[in-house]
């Protein structure tokens, strides 16, 4: 591997490349667009486009694409070449400002939730100059937003950018009251990406992994994660080679891949980046997932990003580390060193607490999916109940403020009032892995997102709801006669009114859901239950207020999320039916036949046949149970076709089909433990999880 600083970002049209290749005036104009959102003149765009093209062609590119993030949660691209015909029958390489700034892919084939009809194909991509263009597979990729002819957002990025502007404006109102000279506030994110690596040859023998991304059948391996020997354990040589290759590719794309390690479950790993501006971090995470999968193929692996690929062991999440900072370098969630900074920190902290409490429903809905339903509340991931962990020390400080008493700590003494907190070291907040939303020293870690989720959705919600509360605070403080008294009262009142959502205990305990209900916290356990929250009037109002989503855009997203849920479970159900009929039941029948023959032969020799007879009886009973469950599932899948309402269909899939699938799996997994290995039609959990060398 070459020297990392030499090649880091070498495939990115970043600031250093812009400085080198653009005229000074053009560079300054582009910087104003990037930093302040100023409109970009078409002449400037032409110069930038030509410089981009020259740089890309020098690096071997022949095509460019507007790279965008439709509501599939994946990325999309349409490749166009740079070639332009000349009069003498040759070609030249051209790329105009218009082609840079705007594209027109067919929008009709992407999920729109009713925003576009199939015959209304026109959709537009618009360049996001704040996210650098990059080279991937010999193509110049230009990060873009994607919208309809009427300006409706058809992607994940557009609402995210809108929400970032909302929190910028709201936070600046608050900072102005504290005399800050900041002119911009940015939301930052560092998404920790978990994933599984399994041998590709074994993966290719499992229809469920291929079609559904997770195992729909499978008895537990004799060993799971109970020895706790995989987490942070020695990384196997083949996996290490994969990780090294992955790092190099990510670094070339300017992605700050920082930490890699084994996770809790066997064959599970994690990659964590250094945090970045939310829209850029979102782009980088989408790229990371894409490159993870592509690189895995090179190394003979399959990278599984499903939230729960294997039953009985941990699934994969994506911890979303969220903070807000100013362009003057101040992290607004970092306790300060002066009384004024402490008061400012407390105001932003209480704003987040109130926002999460007021809008816990849409925060939960933002991470809803069929795959993530398997994780949440399964003693491996946070429960589906939103609560906030602050740690004993910070909670003690807030309690003292509410009670108007002095807070004392063995290490620090704090005066309550304006000068509430000293500098608060990161390690004074414990790590409570059972909390869905935890303060970790200078940021909040939202732990509910699933591993394959685009982080655009939850961060759009976070930015918007915090912006709303900051505006409420600003409205009150701006008209106060005595700012200090009003500030103290606001902080104290907000903490008191929102203490119900602060919980530092064990979120996995049986007692917590009961306690949470007493506190008035929501427990939206499934996607069909959670997603409709987007259309509650208070939520429509807050998104509309900031121009993040129109009501029509929210309705489309609810429709898309529920439709995706239904389609996912339908694919899983049909796959289970197929595997049962073509693989599991025939394998069981063959084993029964061979064991029965063995019993006959043994009897003819006068030998005992207890094992053979008992095995045949046990497997036959399980086959009967499985066959009946198969019939029930098939019949219920047929009923789906008569349901027209998407919400009703999603409820049916959750309440009926999902239960049918569980009933079919139970006897199948028991049969697996009884049938000889050479008879079993696909690799077992032991094969998949423990045989990567």
Model-derived features with residue positions:
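Glycine-rich, acidic/polar active-site loops that bind/position phosphate-bearing ligands
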Residues: 121-305, 314-317, 324-559
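Hydrophobic alpha-helix feature that most strongly marks membrane-spanning transmembrane helices
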Residues: 69, 87, 297, 327, ...
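Short linear, low-complexity motifs centered on an aromatic residue
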Residues: 73-88, 108, 206, 213, ...
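Active-site-proximal loop/turn and secondary-structure-junction residues that shape catalytic pockets
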Residues: 44-48, 68-70, 98-99, 146, ...
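Gly-rich Lys/Arg/Thr-decorated short loops/hinges at beta-loop-alpha junctions or inter-strand turns
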Residues: 2-14, 33-35, 151-152, 222-231
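Active-site core of metal-dependent hydrolases
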Residues: 7-120
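C-terminal amphipathic alpha-helical interaction region
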Residues: 491, 496-693
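Hydrophobic/aromatic-rich, well-ordered segments within soluble, folded domains that form packed cores
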Residues: 61, 65-69, 282-298, 324, ...
